[in-house]
Amino acid sequence: ARRAAALVEVAWEPVMPLLDLAEAIEAESFHTEPQWIRRGDVEHELAAATASLDAVVVEGTFRTGAQDHFPLETHVSLALPESDGRILVHSSTQHPSETQAVVAHVLGISLNQVVVQCARMGGGFGGKESQANAWAAIAALGAAKTGRATFVRLDRDRHMTMTGKRHPFLARYRAAMGRDGQLRAFDVALYSDGGWSLDLSDAVTGRAMMHVDNAYFWPAMRVRGQVVRTDKVSQTAFRGFGGPQGVAVAEEVIDRLARAAGLDPHVVRARNLYAAAGEAGTTHYGEEIGDDRLRTIWTDLERSSSFLSRRDDVAAWNASSDAVRRRRRRGIAMTPVKFGISFTTTFLNQAGALVNVLVDGSVQVHHGGTEMGQGLQIKLSQVAADAMGVPLTSIRMMATRTDVVPNTSATAASSGTDLNGGAIMAACATLRARMAPVAATLLSGDGVEVTADEVHFEAGSVSATSRPGVRVSFADVARTAHRERVSLSSTGFYRTPHIWFDRETGKGRPFAYYACGAAVTEVEVDGFTGEMHVRRVDILHDAGASINPLVDIGQVEGGFVQGMGWVTMEEVVWDAAGRTLTHAPSTYKIPAATDVPSDW
């Protein structure tokens, strides 16, 4: 295959590429029309602040860079031709149903002739949400044309050269704050670099617009978002999906306003955190925060991390003769985060599942999510075990297949456990309801007639309130139900309730809830070489009733390190023709074990 690929000759006509965001904006090279989210009279507030001695106004431009997903496993697909023109595709994809649709479109066949299966991926981070589709389609086309199994795998160079990255953003902003530290108005235009064609850029930009407030209440806001067309690879989803870019802009603006007013940025942040309710507890798109977690987390972390005393220690160290002589400086900062959980495209917030109870008491669970190392399968195993009342060892998670659970949404938007877990719980509830009357019959005796509503499934055994000393095994109930022709297979469906968003008005309730947290980061920088080391990190994150604390801690730590890499060392470089120069580990550097904070 590689020898054949080398024989292909491509003819093209060179053009002057548009690569810089600012230049592309100036050239009016856009993929989309502007989106808007508005609250209050921004122009009035900015004008009033400009004319007042009691306020400060800042304006400027802020950029965020690209980032490569760098999964351990590159894009890979195996297509197998089956009878009657059907195709089975094993794909490293976060979105099997979309991959199924693209393969069917390329082959010119209906969806029911294509099955996509994903057992697991070697990393995704959003890079396999939509961009896995092309390689699956190429493999499927090869299988359809030759009648033979076709395998497509990108080597690292091709993967990094040909696939999209985290969207670079350019923000142009004006903001006003009273000299008392109270935020007044924020006018910001967010431009995302979508590359040469439109992938998920419109939705990425939309989420950035919803997160450019981060954790802070602005009485007046005007947010413009637009996708810019450049002659680069088509940029795609990446962990956070525009949220980190919006948050970065928010924190830059807070820092600039605080310094312009001569105030402590830490105090400004604390003063403007969202409240639980009322106007100060409502986002610029109209969703109420609903609780006071941000302020609680802030106060708790400030205390547990000894932030204020450590900040004094940092200032003293920087003033020491040793630090001055060595040209080294330390810094410490505390920042919050508020991240909305749900797809902002409302209809995607749905999931299905199929749960089968076998006659030996073991359970098979099918769902539409995909495992990419984030711990989805173990969490959903725990959900199923708890819902069915069986040991974790009785649960078997099956590979994700579009012919078993169809019409799925991508495993993205931090929604995989919520959506698929809800569907699994619904299926398990149906099965318990079917099995309870059977169990009640088995548990009845000694003149006591057990009813179905008093049956309890727990840890692989079944009991009843009215006969506390009597138990039967879950396997016995399953075998008896099968003999009595009770269905031991059930689908489940879940859709996130009470969410909506109107793009025309820029208002709605797009998120089921917010994940909130805060971090204190202490760093040391060599003022001569620029070398940086993270000395200590304290993170406090509200995980709710955590299903698996170890998995959640791993996600928090991994997310921090990946974000640290994005803002400190990972730099995607394109040449003057738009070719990716950082196409291998030799030229693109991600955090190593030595870069992990010394003290977590």
Map each language-model feature to its residues.
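Cofactor-binding beta-sheet edge motifs in enzyme active sites
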Residues: 1-296, 300-303, 310-600
